[in-house]
Amino acid sequence: MTPAREIGAFNILVFLIFLWLLSKLVGRLGRRGRTTPLRGPANKSLLFGLTRYINVEADDSGAVYESWAAEYGPAFRVPGVLGSHRIVICDAKAIAHFYSKETFGYVQSPRARSTIKNIVGRGLLWSEGESHRRQRKALSPAFSNAAIRRLTSVFFDSSYKMKAAWDSILETNPDNTVIDVQKWMNHISLDSIGIAGFSHDFGSLDGKHSDVAAVFDSFGSINPSYFSMVIFLLALVFPILLKLPTNRNLLVLKLRERTSEIADVLLERTRKEKEGRTGTVEEKSIIGLLIKAESAETELHMSQEEIVAQMNVLLLAGYETTSSKTFLTWALIELSKNPEKQAKLREELLSQYTTTDPTWEQLANGLPYLDSVVHEILRLHPPVGETFRVAAEDDIIPLSRPLVTLSGQTVSSIAIGKGTMVGVPIRCMNRSEVLWGKDAKEFRPERWLEPGFGENNEVQGHRHLLTFIDGPRTCLGRGFALAEFKAVLSVLIRKYAFEFPGPGGAVPKIEKHRSILPRPKVEGQDGAKVPLRVRRVE
């Protein structure tokens, strides 16, 4: 290419970029004109806004949002990347309205959809509107109470397989054995979703190598460079940047390849079993429903691409997002910090189940302190700290209490212009002192047993929590995660006592380890490790 042509091409490129930026500016000004002008924190960076501060620098994003809500009211504006802004709502009435319009009135941002598509494909997490409703309806029978009841034995089987491995380890040093509990919770989650969802045993509890687990875990083994972080944050405005070959983006592609390969193998095996009658495929199992949807000539039909994407989603959810592994790890951390609460839970469990295991019904309704511990962990440690969506249409969001706008006007609702980014700070709402009291940041399961508890809490999510979100996108696997969490924890606490391995059981600092989603880790450990001293309960 001649120099003149290079200059001409460069000028055209600059002109196109200018037009693109101009169109974005006009669109942003239009949205601002239709959106109620709200107060909010000052911008810290023209490039990142407050996005980097919230997602990278702040120790507790929930506490940050809570402080802003106290200063600016139940809805406020937060500066984003390249001069953009987001509306954050910390009001129960507003949040209920927001979640009720999910997949239609409020949809995922282009970056979120690109990220989801890159990781798992065009499945339930990616879809919106009628496509989301169709896919969710096709999968719902696999997560009914009847289905979870049948799967409870799988969770106990995995628990006892882990117990056998731990007992073998404890034989050599019964009083001073330290075990990285997070690693074993990873194994339980992967094997349970494999058997319960796909009739496939990954064998990680038996020490078998799993490519899927290795790729999942590799997300937490790299320290993202400044360049990678910049690309990830700028992708909020320019989703196409997710295609650049950064370490993180390459890992995403590798994860998608491995999960899709495994999904293809499991699907093909199940099809052959069904056709040749060499095995039995339960039609209401996850993989059975997917096979049924593939052949159905009804509104619930799913394409091959959608089916593989659903399996990728289930592997991701079962191992990472709503997996009980993170909940279980946090439960063992909190119970090690609070030995008296650990003893109280053990007493409840052993008073009823010394030689047998509780049924699904008993796990759900017959063990009040276990239920309280589980829900206190869900409250304090949601795996997803916030959700943001884009308004697909102009909207009016009602508020339960008035706020003062940027112009000084007092309003009881806020206008949202089409294209505005709106978010809910889940961790903030779950830990809000306004909703949960002055001890909201403390691990206190007893709060769930107090008379009248929750009567003044207007949050409409599961048990007044937003951990599983709410509305049309409520986590489909909530019952699965709760049953697995309770079953595994009931075995662990009956069979073992846990404490931190430092002198006198001293509590170390628990840090946030970055992976696909944050995981807990003990300060000073290499990777996402949570070592605890484990002893048998006599």
From Swiss-Prot:
Transmembrane segments: 7-27, 222-242
Top-rank taxon, per record: Eukaryota
Localisation per UniProt entry: Membrane
Keyword line: Heme, Iron, Membrane, Metal-binding, Monooxygenase, Oxidoreductase, Transmembrane, Transmembrane helix
GO MF annotation list: heme binding; iron ion binding; monooxygenase activity; oxidoreductase activity, acting on paired donors, with incorporation or reduction of molecular oxygen
Cofactor: heme
Main subcellular location: membrane
Disulfide bridge map: none
Name the record gives this protein: Cytochrome P450 monooxygenase claO
Species name: Ampulloclitocybe clavipes (Club foot)
